[in-house]
Regions:
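Flexible coil segments in periplasmic/lumen-exposed cytochrome c-class electron-transfer proteins
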Residues: 30-113, 117, 152-270, 305-338
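Acidic, glycine-rich low-complexity segments
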Residues: 273
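Extended intrinsically disordered, low-complexity coil regions enriched in Ser, Thr, Gly, Ala
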Residues: 133-162, 289-300, 305-313
Length: 338
């Protein structure tokens, strides 16, 4: 109505979340059944992992031979030791991103690793961590605060880089956090993951929290999992920020996830209420479209399990309360496909 004050979009999200919280007192919440190992990049409890590899699908982490490596389309050259230096990011494609602040490319030795080392200079990230390009500044700053305050922990204790992120965040200065937040917010989030529905997946090794296909053509049933692997393992091993990932998902999961995301499916709140109709964010609320399904599922599970807390995470408690593990798989597959 003309002359009436307009309610900020984020306030509508808070109201909707509060109403949903009330409804969960009536619906019986689904108790967590244990962290889904696949989402955390660890072997299922009691199983024997196939092995470890850094890339290419076989053997241990290759030793540095001292020879410069090259990537197609790049004029840069780096040795493996340089690629693996957490305080001097191997910037393969400097023209792909804005001028980066020191905290992104160099970090601050000895305790603050460069943001771009794990999350890449363009912020696209990898399945074992998070894509952070395009995140709203306020959201980014709050998440670092949550790490510093020990509010963001993993429900899967073997997910060691969650503790590493906490250790990195604690000594960061406010200026460093602001510089990183503004830098990554200025880089749009673009497609990085190809979702393929299938009944079988390549057999894999676990490499630093990421699945890497074994050499050969061995396959296994996908089960109730999403298996996210590098499109080009050798390039991923060189931390190529242009080489994306393929996410294998169970047949039918995208359509089922669409129903849950768009309508809530009687179990939850429609994601677009808070994250925008296009799922690309709304004000300070982050976008979900096209982001890693492994990351998104483990975050939803952490919120459900109560290990990821903080002022904005608390708004998600009622949203995830009634979601089953199969629901999480479907939601992760659909969001990644957008």
């Amino acid at each position: 109505m003309r002359g009436m004050p307009q309610r900020p979009p984020f306030l509508g999200c808070v109201v909707a979340s509060t109403l949903l919280a009330a409804s969960t007192l009536i619906l019986r919440a689904q108790a967590p059944s244990g962290p889904p190992a696949w989402a955390y990049g660890v072997a299922p409890a009691g199983s024997q992992p196939a092995g470890r590899a850094a890339g290419g699908g076989s053997g241990a982490t290759p030793a540095d031979d001292g020879l410069p490596k090259h990537l197609e389309g790049s004029t840069q050259a780096f040795t493996l030791a340089q690629v693996r230096d957490g305080f001097n990011v191997a910037d393969w494609y400097p023209g792909d991103h804005p001028e980066a602040p020191a905290i992104v490319m160099k970090g601050r030795a000895p305790s603050v690793r460069a943001c771009g080392f794990c999350h890449l200079a363009n912020g696209k990230g990898r399945p074992e961590n998070a894509g952070i390009s395009g995140l709203p500044v306020a959201y980014f700053v709050q998440q670092i605060a949550d790490f510093r305050n020990d509010a963001r922990k993993s429900a899967e204790t073997r997910k060691t880089n969650t503790a590493l992120m906490t250790a990195i965040a604690k000594p960061m200065t406010d200026d460093e956090i602001k510089a990183a937040a503004e830098y990554f917010a200025a880089i749009p989030s673009t497609p990085w993951i190809r979702v393929v529905e299938t009944a079988t997946v390549p057999r894999t090794r676990i490499a630093g929290g990421m699945f890497v296909p074994l050499d050969g053509a061995e396959t296994e049933p996908i089960g109730a999992r999403i298996i996210e692997v590098p499109e080009h393992p050798d390039r991923t091993d060189l931390r190529d920020p242009r080489s994306g990932f393929v996410a294998y998902a169970p047949v039918g999961s995208i359509k089922r996830g669409e129903a849950l995301v768009i309508t809530g499916g009687g179990r939850t709140l429609a994601c677009g209420t808070c994250h925008g109709a296009d799922l690309k964010g709304l004000g300070p609320v982050p976008g979900l479209a096209g982001r890693s399904p492994s990351y998104q599922v483990r975050q939803l599970y952490d919120m459900k399990a109560g290990t990821r807390r903080g002022p904005w995470s608390d708004l998600m408690k009622a949203v995830v309360a009634n979601l089953t593990d199969d629901d999480l798989v479907a939601i992760g597959a659909y969001l990644a496909s957008k």
